[in-house]
Amino acid sequence: MEQDRRRYTRVPECLQIAYEILPSETIKEYLTKDISQGGIRFLTHEFIPKDSSLKIRIIFPKTLFSFGALVRCMWIKEVPYSEEFEVGVEFMDLPPEIIDYLIGYIRHSLNTGELK
């Protein structure tokens, strides 16, 4: 059986994100596929090189909470039979209050099966 290498538990969640690949100022909007304390996975129509730095904003509509963060592209892969790419990014230097929010959000999602 394959062991999961992830440090953090992911929860499936469709959240709106806006991102820009630095140093570009072109903002694109997409939806997440899942989120963890360590990062997010989302789909996009553009190739994002591995190790690229991005600036993102994530919106949690049910709680009216949002935050911006710097992230690093850890991996990217083509989605078969599609013109999309699946991207995994890691949060860089999140403030403690954002980490606390994510931990509570994920814990609530896992305990209730309900996503905020």
Predicted regions and their residues:
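Conserved positions in beta-strands of structured domains
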Residues: 20, 33, 72-74, 92
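N-terminal helix initiation/capping motif
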Residues: 1-37, 104-116
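Short conserved beta-strand and strand-loop elements enriched in small hydrophobics
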Residues: 16-20, 52-66
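Short, solvent-exposed secondary-structure boundary/capping segments
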Residues: 41-44, 79-90
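Short solvent-exposed strand/turn elements
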Residues: 84-102
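Short beta-strand-centered aromatic/proline hotspots
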Residues: 30, 68-77
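Hydrophobic core residues within well-ordered beta-strands of beta-rich domains
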Residues: 13, 28, 54, 67-69, ...
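Short, surface-exposed secondary-structure edge patches
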Residues: 8, 43-47
